[in-house]
Amino acid sequence: MEHTWIFDLDNTLHDSQKKIFPVINHKINIYISELIKIKYIEADKLRQKYWDKYGATLEGLIKHHKVNPSKFLEETHTIENFSELIVPMPGLVKTLSSLKGKKVLYTNGPKNYTNMILKECKIEHFFDGIFSIEDSKFVPKPNEISMELFLDKYQISKAYFVDDIKENLETAKKFGLSTIWITDEVGHPSYIDKKICELSELIKN
């Protein structure tokens, strides 16, 4: 029986923290600052607050400020020199090509952004499905509603779930999935089945 692999995108398949996230966060801060007429530094704090609470800043903006999600994503994820900001994880192509079974991408990122990253990393052909924030009706991980929509769409009951955010994996474990945390953080929560520092460790055992 073939395995099913579920992969997060940002900071799992590519190092978004290094280049592209600072650009996106800056654009979000400007968007928030102009939306609710607050200083940039306060917008930055609010962006982080919503991300910590909901798993995505967008969720907080929808709940508290009635933001149009499609317009928000277009304004904050349309980026010049996009290709220069993408940093694939070491051994990305080799890892994905070596892992046997169905592979599905599950991300809080928007579809166009996701497709562009997969194309830049030359890995789009590895995936049997792509589930973006639009597919979850703009409800992000780790919300259980998002997880239910994802699992129902692809009829998944057993799979390996690879993510850098432990809260997402906690939700995945509630649905019976095997959890793999890619992180350099200390600690090993009980809902984590395997902990790795680099993506390439998936094929080293």
Which residues make up each language-model segment?
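Conserved residues at beta->alpha junctions
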Residues: 11, 105-108, 163
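N-terminal helical cap/lid subdomain that shapes the substrate entry/recognition surface
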Residues: 2-90
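Substrate-recognition element of Asp-dependent hydrolases with the DxDx(T/V) motif
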Residues: 71-84, 92-119, 130-133
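Residue-level marker of regulatory loop/turn positions in helix-turn-helix DNA-binding domains and
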Residues: 88, 106, 139
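Asp-based, Mg2+/Mn2+-dependent phosphohydrolase catalytic module
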Residues: 1-3, 97, 110-205
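Hydrophobic residues in well-ordered beta-strands that form the structural core
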Residues: 15, 105-107, 181
